[in-house]
Amino acid sequence: MVPKTGVSDRQENKLTQYFDDILRLSADLLTQQQLKTIKLDPKVTTGFSKAQQKGLGDRITQFYSLLDTLDVSLQTTADYVGAVKDSALQLKKQREEEQIKKQEQEKLERQLLEQQKLEQQQLEQKQLKQKQQQQQQQQQQQQQQQPQEQQHEQQQRYSAKNTPIDMLTNFDTDLPSAGITQAQSFNSEFGDLNGMDLSMFDSMDNQVGFGGLQNTSGGNEKKNDPQINFNDTNAPPSAVNVPENGNPSSYLTLNDFNDLGIDWNAANDNNELNLEDFNI
């Protein structure tokens, strides 16, 4: 056997040392067994001594103890590696699940966005359609109202033409009416008739009578109506109905006096007209 120094023992680990001792003792046992078998030396006893057997047993026990410790360490290491691997796999799986969830969330958001966009487009199309329908309805209403407005305007124009001017005009200032202007021009044309002596026309009163004067007054009231005068003026000759007032054909009107050519302004000192040249 080769002696072991302390330095070499410290340098070797226990597992190697125990293994070397086991090999050494086993070699010694085999050598003694062979010597006994071939009986080269009759003094050699069979088997080991008690001390040798005890040393070999201790070494084997320690060796197996180290193997068990190593086995436990390896098992622990394997368990740790397995746990790390499982944790890595679980983390990877978790990341994959998160990635899948993220993709699904993005897909759902895209679908929701597309749906909102589609709904917005449908709403815009609906609003546009409603706007077009409203425009069409407005156009139809305008087309329907336009003939009515034209008809109403024509009716107003027709009413304006057939309405007296005094009834249509509305001025802030006091303007003389057509009747007043006509009366003033009549007075200025014929002068003052208050001083005229109408005793020469007594024959007319006798011929006509009081009833004729009443009819004349009624006729004048009718002539003073602007609407009747306006209608009579614009109406055709065949449409004008001359009222029958019962006056005879010899009844003289103001137009008859105008036809005589009397100068109403040529009066004498007593404000009397000179009718000598006329045969009445």
Curated annotation (Swiss-Prot):
It is found in: Nucleus. InterPro entries: Mediator_Med2_fun. The keyword Transcription applies. It holds the Pfam family Med2. Residues 212-247 are annotated as: Disordered. GO terms for cellular component: nucleus. Residues 226-236 have a biased composition (Polar residues). The keyword Transcription applies. Keywords: Activator, Nucleus, Transcription, Transcription regulation. Belongs to the Mediator complex subunit 2 family. Component of the Mediator complex. Component of the Mediator complex, a coactivator involved in the regulated transcription of nearly all RNA polymerase II-dependent genes. Mediator functions as a bridge to convey information from gene-specific regulatory proteins to the basal RNA polymerase II transcription machinery. Mediator is recruited to promoters by direct interactions with regulatory proteins and serves as a scaffold for the assembly of a functional preinitiation complex with RNA polymerase II and the general transcription factors. This is Mediator of RNA polymerase II transcription subunit 2. It comes from Kluyveromyces lactis (strain ATCC 8585 / CBS 2359 / DSM 70799 / NBRC 1267 / NRRL Y-1140 / WM37). The lineage of its organism: Eukaryota, Fungi, Dikarya, Ascomycota, Saccharomycotina.
